[in-house]
């Protein structure tokens, strides 16, 4: 009975780890998708050098 209980606990731990890992991976995929849709830092640097663009996007440009 001891071996059967240990095997059951092992399966429970493996299943729990797999489910948690799968859900975490799904969340990170959404974060990656959001990040890939955003403008890169280099593009914001170019925008911040242009006064009209800087005026329209002040939240992305540091104060000078």
From Swiss-Prot:
Residues 1-21 form the signal peptide. Disulfide bonds join 47-53, 48-61. It holds the Pfam family Toxin_8. GO terms for cellular component: extracellular region; host cell postsynaptic membrane. It comes from the Eukaryota. It is found in: Secreted. This is Alpha-conotoxin-like Lp1.7. It comes from Conus leopardus.
